[in-house]
Amino acid sequence: MRFKELVFLLKIDEEELLEKLYEEGFFNFAIEENKEGDRLLRVYLREGETLPSFLSNWKILDERLTTPKDWMVELEPFEIVEDVVVDPTEKVTRTDKIVVKLSPGVAFGTGLHPTTQMSVLFLKKYLKKGDRVVDVGCGTGILAIVAKKLGASYVLAVDVDEQAVEVAKENVQKNSVDVTVKRSDLLSEVEGVFDLVVSNILAEIHLRLLEDVSRVTHEKSILILSGIVDTKEDMVREKAQKKGWNLLERKQEREWVTLVMKRS
């Protein structure tokens, strides 16, 4: 599959950008910093897909046709947290660590972002062998794959974006793990009860998730919420408390917060 890649100078902060992109249902993008310290936004348009409306008056710095393979060449294997290695090259053979083979594609979740790193850290800490796990807003599927490699008995990965679902399925196949991947708007297509729910999405979407997550959890279930910018942490915690979730642990990297909760 080929995409049109457009590069823009990032004019607004990351939180505002993510809100605008998610409001328009646009998920195929990347944020990076160049050698001069400028923050750049790269968006990837499939054939026939239109640019998010708020970008229409932004100046395009660069434009080219590209494929997912082009985006992976600059990514080298790295340790996302202790003993968990992300390998975009598919060349790492070591057996003393958990290795996740990853084709980032155009879905959020290469493992480089602090929200993903904190999510993996808490999966390592709270997931017990044999747990049933659901990853809500799975993106590349990285958290679901880690959960399975950590010993979960059943893992379901869901995302509302069809491209993310396809990328996640590809990554599951690369890692030879038994993870079910399907399209779902949060938990709308999810049935059953899970021991652990992990979700690395925006704070506003967590508010929607909290409306329904009790339906698929039990009194001892663990809920990991990541992707929360610190200025919106309070509203997520207040909503969680109203829905019967108590805070177990909190971690912050830069402006990003991850919360671990348990049913009260």
From Swiss-Prot:
InterPro entries: Ribosomal_L11_MeTrfase_PrmA (IPR050078), Ribosomal_PrmA_MeTrfase (IPR004498), SAM-dependent_MTases_sf (IPR029063). Its EC number is 2.1.1.-. S-adenosyl-L-methionine binds at residues 116, 137, 159, 200. One of its GO terms (cellular component) is cytoplasm. It catalyses: L-lysyl-[protein] + 3 S-adenosyl-L-methionine = N(6),N(6),N(6)-trimethyl-L-lysyl-[protein] + 3 S-adenosyl-L-homocysteine + 3 H(+). It holds the Pfam family PrmA. GO terms for molecular function: protein-lysine N-methyltransferase activity. GO terms for biological process: methylation. It is found in: Cytoplasm. It is an enzyme of class 2 (transferase). Keywords: Cytoplasm, Methyltransferase, S-adenosyl-L-methionine, Transferase. SUPFAM superfamilies: S-adenosyl-L-methionine-dependent methyltransferases (SSF53335). Belongs to the methyltransferase superfamily. PrmA family. Methylates ribosomal protein L11. This is Ribosomal protein L11 methyltransferase.
